[in-house]
Amino acid sequence: MESKTFWIVTLLLCGTIQLAICRSEEKSTEKTMMLGGVHDLRGNQNSGEIESLARFAIQEHNKQQNKILEFKKIVKAREQVVAGTMYHLTLEAKEGDQTKNFEAKVWVKPWMNFKQLQEFKESSS
């Protein structure tokens, strides 16, 4: 009987500890990434995929505004989970003889083969 009680108490303690650990990790994750919030891009912001999105943003802006911007580099990349992913990119581009920073928002829904430039403007900083 004593052995049975020992095992029941041990199992209850282990379960309680496991639950506490899971809740602690859950709260930690909530603090670092709020659903729908903009956060720094995980991984390499200069990956081929992100560079491709930056080049797409410049290409679309050039078409829409009849401009000739030339991509130089990605300065900063952030993402936001929406119905898909909204990429917030700060990029450097050459306009004539000047190099300037621009901010672009590109909305991507990979399961629909959808990519759209939502915003493109010269950076104030």
From Swiss-Prot:
Signal peptide start and end residues: 1-22
Where is the protein situated, by its record's location annotation?
A: Secreted
Q: Where is the Cystatin domain?
A: 36-124
UniProt motif (Secondary area of contact) ranges: 80-84
Q: Which GO terms describe its molecular function?
A: cysteine-type endopeptidase inhibitor activity
Q: Record's GO cellular component, any one?
A: extracellular region
Signal among the record's keywords? Answer: yes
- Where does the entry annotate site (Reactive site)? G36
Q: Which GO BP terms apply?
A: defense response; hyperosmotic response; response to cold; response to oxidative stress; response to water deprivation
| Keyword line | Plant defense, Protease inhibitor, Secreted, Signal, Thiol protease inhibitor
The record's function comment reads: Specific inhibitor of cysteine proteinases. Probably involved in the regulation of endogenous processes and in defense against pests and pathogens.
Give the family from UniProt.
Answer: Belongs to the cystatin family. Phytocystatin subfamily.
According to UniProt, the name of this protein is Cysteine proteinase inhibitor 3
Organismal lineage: Eukaryota, Viridiplantae, Streptophyta, Embryophyta, Tracheophyta
